[in-house]
Every structure is written in structure tokens, then in C-alpha cells.
A protein has these predicted regions:
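Flexible loop and strand-edge segments within Gram-negative outer membrane beta-barrel domains
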Residues: 184-252, 266-278, 284-292
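Surface-exposed extracellular loop regions of Gram-negative outer-membrane beta-barrel proteins
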Residues: 195-197, 203-204, 267, 394-408, ...
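Gram-negative outer-membrane beta-barrel transporters
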Residues: 378-384, 393, 496-510, 517-610, ...
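C-terminal beta-signal and adjacent terminal beta-strands/loops
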Residues: 46, 449, 502-507, 554, ...
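Signature of Gram-negative outer-membrane beta-barrel scaffolds
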Residues: 312-436, 462
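Outer-membrane beta-barrel signature, preferentially recognizing the C-terminal barrel domain
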Residues: 219-250, 360-366, 416-426, 430, ...
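Acidic, small-polar-rich N-terminal luminal/periplasmic segments of exported/outer-membrane proteins
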Residues: 1-100, 204, 486
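Periplasmic-side early beta-strands and strand-to-turn transitions of outer-membrane beta-barrels
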Residues: 96-97, 104-110, 114, 121, ...
């Protein structure tokens, strides 16, 4: 979240939810529609299908990141499927980022504390160079607890407003080895392993399940509810092996060649343990969910510079070949802790609570083959940027015994193992015109697409306890988008600014929360929204006040982001669009110290589609977040050339507020009522909190 705290039109959600952050939101598009990658390798999608199966996207440690690139709007020309709404690219540290000029060895030690989650960071990076070889080794560990809410009620169930207690440990290892065997040639090896392990006492679920703001079984009949207590463990791991090779090639076809091969294994293990007491029996019940993605990615990129007449060209072209294998399962057990129906003795197995290993989708293998080309053409004050990409995607479902256990549980439904294939040509055209040395106008048209997931095509789940079913839809069409953007950039001695206006059209938008009409019970089946639009504007700028006689180093900056979304099929708003947001700051920078006072202002959320909303608190409509304004103060001080202290105090006025990304859609279906009922105060952001970091560059 800190990476995009001041970025217009970009946010991160996930407060109060099990598993951590849910991913990026860019211009009203979020989740798996935003491609997130580390060194060109995509991190897994999020997954939710049933009360104990919800994965988030906590796969990246910011301590290894040297640079982040955020691409707003459709980006399929560069990245293919899943970049329909934008892309976030992380680039990891290299030896040159740690070794100081003129030296062959370097190190960076860092320690930090955050009061919002009572977490301590310990990080160490060492790097060295010898002749043609260089290497880097990094290890970081963050130990903390739950991120606080503004609520102070430490009770249980719907009454609880404090965050659920958590113990969190996140670790990351990064190792790199490079061989510069020529001036323009390099061979590199990379190994990375990230792990996020958190234990949660889900006190907000005690006493459930809930319906219309009260326990399903009244507390006068069953004190403590069916769920007497519940704890959970979420372990997220991501391991990557990579090789990268770049070299100069003085030929007619290319000046430079760069290729890479990466293998990544990412896995989410979720385990839930609860004391289950449905009056007739008392059982210690466990539920285990596994979601895993394995992928191989080969990328090759070539570039060639040449001139034709008065135009200069930089042609970039290449290919991407990717294979993803996705597996998932859920299972459970029940052990009697008292004699009752189905429990003949303490310690015996409760057959009614045993969940045979099952899967909600057939394990897919997804093969993607891509070709792309882009030409940067410079002519006088004009720059043209045409691009084209072709993607062929094949999804092969693999019918497993675990999936058959789900499909055949009630003897209904058919199973299809038919392959799905999609072809897509994605064009892009951009141009810029230098009006003067200081001002540049630009325009862009780009297309994007996203293929349906195996879960939406084949996924099945039935929960008779809470009365809902998830049904497959094998007729889903891929999502498609067309994005138009124009803007003006200015850069001059007194400051800079960037103004952008965008209009994005979406076809066949996949709604995974759609309610299937005509069924006796609540049935969710993904469908295509034929047409949707999101339009908006963003402004970002900085003014150097010292150019107008103020003290040297004093500046002001600001950004405003506005977006408007509409489901053109129903006329309803698109809930993933955030309210109008502005961030304004006054800063002061010197060679060895500086600070920034920021004021974040967010308008109340007034356009909401709550036609399918159900709340465990008994509220009939979606909660609309009120507007708010908060102050943050951050600063740094270089004690010596090698030692820097930085920190900040956030929410200075200790204000209670909600972020729309955290609140929207947190309804009674699935996780909200069964595993974590949502008292709205528990979804608030922390009150006044601070961070402090000490960095020593050796």
C-alpha cells in the first residue's frame, strides 16, 4: 500500500480480510484484471470458491524491489491476457544497486518498525564484484501482528470492531549471480523465495453463522453459537528460478537480443480449525484448502535501430511462451469432543463432518504462445508508437478424482473435459507531439483482453448450510477492452504537471458474482456483461516554490483522480470504481534531510450497485463510505553519508475512516458470514500510527 499511497487512480485493498491484501485497483479495474509481475513473471490470481477457500495476492516483499512501473489502462499489447486493466511490474535489486561507485563490495542493512501492525523488519543485502562476475544475496524477515482497525471492541462475533488477532512472519531470500563476459553481453541467474505465514484467531466468526444481524440459532437456545471458536493459518509461498541472457548482435535483424527462462511455483495453504456445535454434536473440525500455480515462462526480445528518410525507428519485437499448471483441493475432518448424534465416543471421527478431498474445478494446464512487435518512430517533433500482439491461448482441463468428488456429490451435473482455445490480436497506437521544449501532448489507443479462468468455466460448489451454490458456465466469452487516452505533460524549471483523460470500453466483462435467475436457492454463475464503460481524468503536478522566492528546497505537489463506471446492460454503477480522490502535499528537501506533509481527501461513495448485496449485519444495502481527509507527515535524515533514518506519522489527527476498496462487496455470501462476518468498524483503517526505519549502506 505504501508504494501507491500518493499515486492518482491506483489503490490497494484488503483491510480486515483473511490472507492480507487483495491486489491493485487501477482506474476502477482490480483483482486478476491487473497483471502483477516480478521480473517479468506473473504472480498467481486470487481465488475464492466457498467459505474456507480464499487466496489473496501477498506474493511480493517490497524490500527486494528497486523499481516499480505502473501501466494504467489496457496493456495487452505488451503483456497479453490479464492486463486488461493495467499492469504493475516489480524489478528486483541487482548487485550494482548495492555496490557503491569505485568499490567491489557493498552491503545494505535495514531495520524498521511499524506501529500499525506492531511489526519489526530486519533486512540484509550483500553484493560483490570480481572481474567479470558479480553476485548479490538478500534476506529479510518481518515479524508482526494484525493491522489495527479504529475499533476498540475486543469482543467476539458481530460485536467485535477490533481487528482479529494475528501473528505474522514474512521472509524473503533473493540470490543473483552475473557474468559480464563481454562489454554488451551478460548471463545472469536468479533464485527467489518468498513466504508469508500468518496465524489468525478469527474472533469475529465466533457465535456464527449469522443471518440478518443475528446468530442463525439464537444465543438463548445455543450460547456461543454453532462456531464456538475458530482459528486459521494462511501460508503463502512463491519460489522462482530464472536465467537471463542479453548480448549485442550487429546484424540486419537486431542490434540487441535479450531472452529469459523462469520457473515459478506459487502456493497458498489455508487451514481452519473450529469447535463446531450444531446442538446435536460437538466436534473439533478442520478444513484445509490448497491452491497452487506452477509456470514456465520463456521471453525473447530483440531490438533494431534504423532510419528511413527523415524518420528514426526503434523496432522491438519478440515472443513469449508460457505454461501454467493450476491445482486446488479442499478437505476436512471432524473429531468428537463430546458424545452426541454421530459421536459414539470422545475422540471418535464424526462422519458428518468429514470432507473427502475435493476440488472445485478440473486442474487446468494453460499454454500461451505470443508474438509482438512495436516500432518507435521519431519524425521532427512527432513520435509515433504503433504496436501489435498476437496471443494463442489453450486451456486443457484435467478431470481429477477430487473434482469428480465435487461434481458427483449429489449425482447431478455433467463433466466436460473439452479444451478451450482463444486467439486474439491486440493493437496499440500511441503518438506524442512536442509543442515546445517544455510541453508535450500525447494520445493513445490500446486494446486488452482476458481469458476466462477454469474456476468460472468449470467451478462448482454447493453449501446447503448457508443455502447457496456456485455453478459453472462453459460458454463464457473472453473479456475485451478498448482504451482511449489523451493528455498534456509539462516539465520546466518551476515544476511539472501531467493531465490525462481516459475512456475505456469493455465487452463481455465477466461477473463472477452474478446470480442465476430462476433457481430455487441462491445460485452464483459467472456471466458476461455485454457492455461496460469507465471514464475519468487524472491530474498530477509539482511546483518548486523556491523558484518564486521561497527557501531553497521548498515545494508543493498534488494529484486528483476521478473515474465514473457504468454497467451498460443494467445501467448500474461499477462497484470497483473508487470515489474522487485528491492528495496534496507540502515538502522540503535538503542534501541530508527532508520532509513531506500530505493531505489526502476522499469524497463519499454515492454511486453503488447493491442489487445483489446481502449483509451479515442485517443492513439491506451496501455501506457507502463517507468522505474523509487525513494528514500524514514523513521525513528522512542522513546521519552520515552511509546512515539514513526515515519515518512517518500517519493519520495525524487520529480520524476514523474507511477505504472503499476494503468495504465493497463484503457481503454475507461465503467468507463474510461463514468465516469472517464483517462488522463495518472492523474494516476501518488504523488510527494515528507511525513507522521508523534505519538504513546503513556500507
Amino acid at each position: 500500500k505504501d508504494l501507491v499511497r500518493y499515486e492518482p487512480g491506483v489503490s490497494v485493498g484488503g483491510a480486515g480480510q483473511r490472507g492480507g491484501i487483495s491486489g491493485y485497483n487501477i482506474r476502477g479495474i482490480d483483482g486478476d484484471r491487473i497483471l502483477t509481475q516480478v521480473d517479468g513473471v506473473e504472480i498467481p490470481n486470487g481465488f475464492f470458491n466457498g467459505p474456507y477457500a480464499k487466496s489473496q495476492r501477498n506474493y511480493v516483499d517490497p524490500e527486494i524491489v528497486k523499481r516499480v512501473e505502473i501501466l494504467r489502462g489496457p496493456a495487452s499489447v505488451l503483456y497479453g491476457s490479464n492486463a486488461i486493466g493495467g499492469a504493475v511490474s516489480y524489478y528486483t535489486l541487482d548487485a550494482d544497486d548495492i555496490i557503491k561507485p569505485g568499490k567491489d563490495v557493498g552491503a545494505r542493512l535495514k531495520s524498521g518498525y511499524s506501529s500499525a501492525d506492531d511489526s519489526w523488519l530486519k533486512s540484509a543485502t550483500v553484493a560483490g564484484r570480481s572481474g567479470e562476475f558479480d553476485g548479490l544475496l538478500h534476506y529479510s524477515q518481518r515479524d508482526g501482528h494484525e493491522t489495527e482497525s479504529f475499533g476498540g471492541n475486543n469482543g467476539t462475533g458481530l460485536a467485535r470492531t477490533a481487528a482479529n488477532p494475528e501473528d505474522v512472519r514474512a521472509t524473503n531470500v533473493l540470490a543473483k549471480l552475473g557474468w559480464n563476459y563481454n562489454d554488451d553481453s551478460r548471463l545472469g541467474l536468479t533464485y527467489e523465495k518468498y513466504k508469508d505465514d500468518r496465524d489468525t484467531d478469527q474472533k469475529s466468526a465466533y457465535g456464527g453463522p449469522y443471518f440478518n444481524g443475528a446468530p442463525t440459532i439464537p444465543s438463548s437456545v445455543l450460547p456461543g453459537g454453532m462456531y464456538q471458536w475458530r482459528t486459521g493459518n494462511d501460508t503463502i509461498t512463491r519460489e522462482r528460478f530464472g536465467i537471463e541472457h542479453s548480448f549485442a548482435l550487429d546484424s540486419l535483424l537486431a542490434d540487441n537480443v535479450k531472452w529469459s527462462l523462469n520457473h515459478q511455483i506459487a502456493k497458498t495453504d489455508q487451514s481452519t480449525e473450529e469447535l463446531y456445535y450444531p446442538i446435536t454434536r460437538k466436534v473439533l473440525r478442520t478444513r484445509d484448502t490448497i491452491y497452487e500455480e506452477k509456470q514456465w515462462v520463456f521471453d525473447a526480445q530483440l531490438d533494431k535501430a534504423f532510419a528511413i528518410g527523415d524518420t528514426d525507428h526503434l523496432l522491438t519485437y519478440g515472443t513469449t511462451i508460457k505454461q501454467q499448471k493450476v491445482t486446488g483441493s479442499r478437505s476436512g475432518d471432524g473429531t468428537c469432543v463430546a458424545v452426541g448424534r454421530g459421536c459414539t465416543a470422545i475422540g471418535a471421527t464424526s462422519a458428518a463432518d468429514v470432507l473427502a478431498k475435493a476440488s472445485d474445478f478440473p486442474d487446468p494446464t494453460i499454454n500461451t504462445y505470443s508474438l509482438f512487435a512495436q516500432d518507435q518512430i521519431s519524425w521532427n517533433d512527432w513520435t509515433f508508437l504503433p504496436g501489435l500482439r498476437y496471443d494463442y491461448t489453450q486451456l486443457k482441463p484435467h478431470i481429477t478424482e477430487e473434482f469428480l468428488n465435487t461434481v458427483n456429490a449429489d449425482g447431478q451435473g455433467t463433466v466436460s473435459d473439452k479444451n478451450k482455445t482463444w486467439h486474439k490480436v491486440s493493437p496499440k497506437f500511441g503518438l506524442t507531439y512536442a509543442l515546445t521544449d517544455n510541453y508535450t501532448w500525447y494520445g493513445q489507443y490500446a486494446e486488452g483482453f482476458r481469458t476466462p479462468t477454469a474456476k468460472s468455466l468449470y467451478g462448482r460448489f454447493e453449501n446447503n448450510t448457508t443455502g447457496y451454490t456456485v455453478a459453472p458456465n462453459s460458454d463464457l466469452e473472453p473479456e475485451k477492452s478498448k482504451g482511449f487516452e489523451t493528455g498534456l505533460r509539462g516539465n520546466f524549471e518551476q515544476g511539472s504537471f501531467d493531465v490525462a483523460v481516459f475512456y475505456n470500453k469493455y465487452r463481455d466483462f465477466i461477473n463472477e458474482d452474478a446470480v442465476k435467475p430462476g433457481d430455487d436457492q441462491l445460485t452464483f454463475q459467472s456471466n458476461n456483461i455485454k457492455r461496460a464503460t469507465i471514464k475519468g481524468a487524472e491530474v498530477k503536478g509539482r511546483l518548486n516554490l523556491d523558484a518564486f522566492g521561497a527557501p531553497q528546497g521548498l515545494y508543493t505537489q498534488g494529484s486528483i483522480a476521478y473515474a465514473y463506471g457504468r454497467n451498460n446492460d443494467s445501467g448500474e454503477p461499477i462497484n470497483s470504481v473508487n470515489p474522487l480522490t485528491g492528495v496534496f502535499g507540502l515538502g522540503y528537501d535538503q542534501d541530508n534531510y527532508g520532509g513531506l506533509l500530505s493531505w489526502t481527501v476522499v469524497k463519499k461513495k454515492d454511486r453503488v450497485d447493491d442489487s445483489n448485496f446481502k449483509s451479515p449485519d442485517g443492513v439491506s444495502s451496501q455501506f457507502k463510505t463517507p468522505g474523509f481527509g487525513i494528514l500524514d507527515l514523513a521525513g528522512y535524515y542522513k546521519v552520515t553519508d552511509d546512515v539514513t533514518v526515515s519515518g512517518g506519522v500517519y493519520n495525524l489527527t487520529d480520524k476514523k475512516y474507511w477505504l472503499w476498496d476494503d468495504v465493497r462487496g463484503y457481503d454475507s455470501v461465503g467468507e463474510a458470514s461463514v468465516t469472517q462476518p464483517a462488522n463495518l468498524d472492523r474494516l476501518t483503517q488504523p488510527g494515528r500510527n507511525f513507522t521508523i526505519n534505519l538504513i546503513w549502506d556500507i
